[in-house]
Amino acid sequence: NEVTNSEYIRIFASSFQIFLRNDYPIFLLMTGLYENIYNLQNDKVLTFLYRAPKLILEPLNYTAIRKQYMDIFSLDIDAAGELASLTKGYPFAFQVLGYLYWENRDKKTLEQILPEYDQYLDEYVYSKIWSELSDLDKKIVTEMSLSGETQVKALRERLDMKSELFSVYRERLKRKGVIISKEYGKVTLALPRFDEFVKIQQLM
């Protein structure tokens, strides 16, 4: 679980490859962030991982999340939909927002819960992600957060970046799970309220 390209994982994976060659009846299931799996399989002695079946997990289904919130909190479809939208299908956000709403449902409005929700995302996830971004990664994400721009061409022009360079960093940010590109020529932030987190970083 949560594998990274560490020395111990490399040793273990190398040993596992030997066990496979000896036809031992063993199986290995690895889970982790896309970027960490990507870096691990690119290790020159672990190329066998390229041939291993991979399942890339998509965000949780919006309709399923909305239904859960409707059932648990006895909400109408619009109120549950508003909650579901705030998670963007991110599992940790789904859990945290559900917990906070349950704890405060009779005391606070959803708007009043958001600061604590943002704090959880910041402390447990976003600060770590932000610390691992390069300066140019941050520059791109900051421009997306402040301007709300999603058109790749417009973003490149705002950032004064050539297409080739922007493409490299777009792929980096996709591997890190920070942005998604579901439509040709467009990119959006993948994480819920990450734009709010980024805006706060500019004030620090």
Task: Walk through the language-model features, giving the residues of each.
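Conserved Walker B catalytic segment
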Residues: N1-E35, N42-V45
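A short helix-loop-helix "switch/interaction" segment in the helical subdomain of ASCE P-loop NTPases
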Residues: D78-F92
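Alpha-helical DNA-recognition elements
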Residues: S14-S15, L100, R172-K176
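Minor-groove-contacting beta-hairpin "wing" of winged helix-turn-helix DNA-binding domains
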Residues: G185-P192
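Short amphipathic alpha-helical interaction segments
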Residues: L159-K176, S181-Y184
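Short, amphipathic alpha-helical interaction segments positioned at domain boundaries
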Residues: P192-M204
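Winged-helix-like regulatory helical subdomains adjacent to P-loop NTPase cores
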Residues: A93-L165
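Conserved small helical "lid"/interfacial subdomain of P-loop NTPases
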Residues: A52-A80
